[in-house]
Each structure stands twice: as C-alpha cells, then as structure tokens.
Amino acid sequence: MTENFWRELPRPFFVLAPMEDVTDVVFRHVVSEAGRPDVFFTEFTNSESYCHPDGKDSVRGRLTFTEDEQPIVAHIWGDKPENFRKMSIGMAELGFKGLDINMGCPVPNVAGNGKGSGLICRPAVAAELIQAAKAGGLPVSVKTRLGYTDVDEWREWLTHILKQDIANLSIHLRTRAEMSKVDAHWELIPEIKKLRDEVAPDTLLTINGDIPDRQTGLKLAEQYGVDGIMIGRGIFTNPFAFEKEPKEHSSKELLDLLRLHLDLHDEYSKEEARPYKPLPRFFKIYLRGFRGASELRNQCMNTKSTDEVRALLDDFERKYLDGIE
C-alpha cells in the first residue's frame, strides 16, 4: 500500500460526505472557503461506466479535483471486482489519496440491483470488491449503513466488513429501509466501537447521521471515542458547518458564497461541460434567513444562466444593501 493518509489525520477528523450531484469540484471549493473539512470525497462514480470503452469521458467531471483539496478520496460504486481492480489502479494514477466503496446508497435502482446498500445482502461480493480495490495500492475505505432492512443486522454486517482489513469504516447510522426518515441510531455507537476494537482495532471508525456541525461532532467524538465525523445533509442548512470557531454569519457572506459558487461553476465548465440545470438546487443553502431571501430564491430558481443569477443578486444588493448584515 502507498502512504495511508488516514493515519496522519487529526483526531477527530472531519469529512464532507459524498453526495450525488452535490460534492463535485465546484461545491467542494465553496465548502473549503466557508470552513474546510479534513477529508474530501468525490461524488459517486460508477465503476462500470469508468471501465467502459467510452465511459471515462462520461465520468471525467466527477473525478475532477485540484491539489489544494488533498487529501481527496474517490468514492466509487458497482458490483464487479474486475472493474474495481481497474479503477483502483486508475485512481492511483490520477493522484487520489484513497478509494472509498459505496455500500450504503439506498436508491432503488442501485440497491435493488445489488449495488450500494444492496451489497449488505451480498457479503461475499462486498468482500471481493474490497480486495479488488486494493490493487492500486491506495488505502481502501467503506461507507455503509447499519443494515438493509433491520437495525439488528448491524453486528453481523459490520463484523464482516471489519474483517476485510480496510483503512476506515464510515457508518451512516440508519438502515437502507429507514433512508433518512428516522433519527440516526447514536445509541449504537458504543457497541459499534466496541466491535471495532475487538475485530479490527487498526480500522478507523467514522460516524455519520444527524450531525449538523463540527461542534456537535466534537461532542460525539469526546463522548464515544470515535475517530472521525462525517457531515452530509447538514451542509445544506449551514455551509459553515466545518468552521473551527462558530460565529454568526452575515447575509452578505452567504451571498458572496453564492457568487463564488457561480464563478467556480463557470470556471470549471470551461474544462468540462457542466449543465446549468442542477445548479438551482444549491440556492437554498445561501438564500435563507434574511429579509427578502425567500423572494430572491424564488426568482433565482427560474433562471437559465449564472449571469441571470448575478443580475438578480446585483439588483437585490442595490435595493437592500443597507439591510444586509
């Protein structure tokens, strides 16, 4: 194995969770500006697409990163060991510091086909994928859930994964069936940590689920002794979730982050075509909590280009500048 960066991280370390159509190079840079985590993951990258003769072009945008994002981990999914073997070698050549396997995605057309969280029902395949992913020499990690249907599945499933000699295990503390509809099962953390200590003490343990910010994560790490904290959906309500010294943020700061997002979208679109259509989903992150935010957000949702959004922001700031705090 090449250098295992996980071992060099502070304790606890903080990770921005991989999120489909969210954690691309553009949004990661916005988060880094607002408050940087210790580790970045890419979006979900389909190993089958990557290994298809024409596939590398289709996933190139998902694998775009810059060196100032290091350490960054390629987050991949699929169910064919040979594809994982090829992809692990390719990710090492691209300069990624680690490879993370998705065993938690609950989306029906993924899980229902035995991929993502569907691998919980295919433990032998899951083990094969992990071993194949080690071919490139990168530290291999896994992101998964407590179980597929029942919470009680966690012990057998996590024991199996911990026996595979992985660098880090990130656990979304819900089952596939629960999606995100129930509270994360924080109450299981002590038992899960005990299991890790017994089965694979060298594997780092990262928890995920209902953790809104660094401060909450620090309390959980102190209480339970886990190694890492992963924040996902919390970033949508607080783009400053990873900041080390929490403080009140002005509306101007939020608008400036949105402008940065627009600028980065345009910049990276020059390298790889990036459709505008997914961009408005991010507006709710920045356009909230200040006078006129709701109306401005509704206007921005109907735009067709970044320049249209900038024009609306310019107009808004001219009208409300004195009220922006």
Swiss-Prot record:
**Cofactor annotation:** FMN
Keyword annotations for this protein, in alphabetical order, are: Flavoprotein, FMN, NADP, Oxidoreductase, RNA-binding, tRNA processing, tRNA-binding
Report a single Gene Ontology molecular function.
Answer: tRNA dihydrouridine synthase activity
Q: Which residues form the active site?
A: C105
Gene3D superfamilies, per the entry: Aldolase class I (3.20.20.70), Putative flavin oxidoreducatase, domain 2 (1.10.1200.80)
Q: Which SUPFAM superfamilies match?
A: FMN-linked oxidoreductases (SSF51395)
Q: What is its EC number?
A: 1.3.1.-
Positions contributing to FMN binding = P18, M19, E20, K143, N208, G209, D210, G232, R233
InterPro entries in the cross-refs: Aldolase_TIM, DUS-like_FMN-bd, DUS_fam, tRNA-dHydroUridine_Synthase_C, tRNA_hU_synthase_CS
Catalytic activity from the UniProt record: a 5,6-dihydrouridine in tRNA + NAD(+) = a uridine in tRNA + NADH + H(+); a 5,6-dihydrouridine in tRNA + NADP(+) = a uridine in tRNA + NADPH + H(+)
The reply on keyword GTP-binding is no
Cystine bridges: which residues?
none
Q: Which family does it belong to?
A: Belongs to the Dus family.
Tell me what this protein is called.
Probable tRNA-dihydrouridine synthase 2
